[in-house]
A protein has these predicted regions:
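Canonical Rossmann dinucleotide-binding motif of NAD(H)/NADP(H)-dependent dehydrogenases/reductases
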Residues: 5-36
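A glycine-rich helix->loop->beta "capping" turn
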Residues: 56, 77-88, 96
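Substrate-binding pocket helix/loop in short-chain dehydrogenase/reductase
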Residues: 99-100, 104-112
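Active-site helix of classical SDR
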Residues: 123, 159
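C-terminal helical subdomain
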Residues: 183, 199-236
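The beta1-alpha1 cofactor-binding region of Rossmann-like NAD(H)/NADP(H)-dependent oxidoreductases
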Residues: 44-45, 63-73, 105
Length: 302
């Protein structure tokens, strides 16, 4: 007998980095299901504009996922304006790429602060009220790079491996509480973050809506591992049965080793510049970081 899908009508959903890309597509998909959406983004103006596209009731709010006080304020506003939080989607992330030995420390810190610490903070803050109500769903956006190491994206892969491990551990801790956890692992997506990345033979770039639809499905039919496309799960299982040399040889045959290592730099230039302005670690009112970069209102994009 087929399982009945859970209704998302009236559910309060908070999406970090939700003003663009996967976050925006997911917000639209959930709004069509009747959910009420809070868009959190460092670009507050764009967050409000995105929320206005979703219809009455949804809100756009400023959020810097690298600051706990900003995250607390965001979730407090969500509860005050929309009601108790039912779902949090930790989506904010950046992906500057290049040879690991040439990566400066500020870039590495930025990725870790946004991609990992942002997920940790969002998950920690969401758990207590969800456990108290014995209901809720935490969705952490990782990547298929969280299951492998890809040249050109060493630190990015490290953050996504961490998100997968974090999600597995938290899921085990929350067993029996009524709170669900999902980790989403997309292949390359046709967003600004994926701009300039080469195609691999037989693998088509995903659209943000493809990922959004799988997130909606994971909320309606709760599951932990959310592979996008779904066929990736079987491919990953088969690959893990092969010895390392075999896996690496197949990866080279499919040009997987070139996806992040050999991008079209001209096509990625605008994204890389904007990602570099997603400056974490500044105290409120502070205009300069230790690297001398000025803080600007730039979302953590996907």
């Amino acid at each position: 007998m087929a399982k009945e899908p859970r209704s998302l009508q009236g559910k309060v959903v908070a999406i970090t980095g939700g003003a663009r890309g996967i976050g925006k597509a997911t917000a639209k998909a959930l709004a069509r299901e009747g959910a009420v959406i809070a868009i959190g983004d460092l670009d507050a103006e764009l967050a409000r504009a995105t929320a206005s596209e979703l219809g009455e009731g949804s809100v756009g709010l400023e959020l810097d996922v690298t600051r706990r006080d900003s995250f607390e304020n965001f979730l407090d506003q969500v509860s005050e304006r929309l009601g108790p939080l039912d779902v949090i989607i930790n989506n904010a992330g950046i992906m500057p790429i290049g040879p690991f030995a040439e990566e400066d420390d500020a870039t590495a810190k930025r990725m870790i602060d946004i991609n990992l610490h942002g997920v940790i903070t969002g998950t920690k803050l969401a758990i207590p009220p969800m456990v108290q109500r014995r209901t809720g769903h935490i969705v952490n956006i990782a990547s298929q790079a969280g299951k492998a190491g890809v040249p050109g994206g060493a630190t990015y892969c490290a953050t996504k491996h961490a998100v997968v491990g974090l999600s597995e551990a938290v899921r085990a801790e929350l067993r029996g509480t009524g709170v669900e956890v999902s980790v989403v692992m997309p292949a390359v997506v046709n967003t600004e973050l994926g701009s300039g990345l080469p195609d691999t033979p037989g693998v088509k770039k995903l659209e943000p809506e493809d990922v959004a639809n799988e997130i909606v499905n994971a909320l309606k039919f709760p599951k932990f591992d959310v592979w996008v496309p779904r066929s990736s799960a079987a491919i990953s299982t088969v690959m893990q049965l092969l010895p390392r040399r075999g896996r690496e040889a197949i990866g080279r045959l499919l040009n997987v080793d070139k996806v992040l290592a050999e991008p079209d730099k001209g096509a990625r230039a605008a994204y890389e510049e904007r990602a570099a302005r997603s400056e974490p670690g500044l105290e409120p009112g502070e205009g300069e970081s230790g690297s001398g970069k000025k803080r600007t209102k730039s979302a953590a994009p996907r």
